[in-house]
Amino acid sequence: NKIIGTNSDFAVFSFYATKNITCGEGGAIILNNKNHYENIKSISNNGMTKPAMKRFENNKYSHWDVITKGFKANLSDINASLLEKQIKIYDQKMIKRKKIYDNLYKKISNIKSITLPISNSNVLRDYHLFPIGVDVKKRDKLISFLNKNHIQVTVNYRSITELTYYKKKYKFQCSVSEKWGQQTLSLPFHLKINKKDIDYIYSKLNSFFRR
């Protein structure tokens, strides 16, 4: 019964535009060490000791300093303001996302040429994407076919061992992730998908594999 992010020293969450909780661009780091917390705050604000809002407190001005190399990576107030309401209704949205996911899963599971990820009943999912696996030789043809039929699909995740930078830097293989990365594509999945959409996606997938 542990929440994700509580089993490690650090956990990183993305609030990118396509995520279930979004502020357009940005993210959050959760950690359990005060020293690391202060360091990360500084690094994310150009290595400064104090952000602008902290330089004048208790009627006294505090001069700032730069104590380390840093980045301009702190979240703006405007971006942050978009998160509060979404977090409050997160559980409510997840119920709807799960229902859509289950309906799509049930429909597509009838197509034997498609591999679907196995869910663990002991783990609560976020239902972020709907990835499927297909024959490597047919994957890119299926992507073109679906896009021509106005079903926008994409490949979200590839094995990093097959990406040029990491392939050159690290000499190792991850056979399972490589195999899945070559087979996978993500179907449309969002809160506005309805039964008609699911039936249409299914019909096009079915027609492709019946050819």
Where do the PLM segments sit?
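Charged, amphipathic alpha-helical interaction segments
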Residues: 16-19, 32, 102
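PLP-dependent aminotransferase class I/II
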Residues: 34-211
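Short beta-strand-to-turn element immediately C-terminal to the catalytic PLP-Schiff-base lysine
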Residues: 14, 27-33, 84
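Short glycine-enriched loop/turn motifs at secondary-structure junctions
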Residues: 20-24, 123-126
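Short, hinge-like loop/turn segments at secondary-structure boundaries
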Residues: 2-7, 29, 171-173
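Conserved active-site segment immediately N-terminal to the catalytic lysine
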Residues: 1-23, 62-67
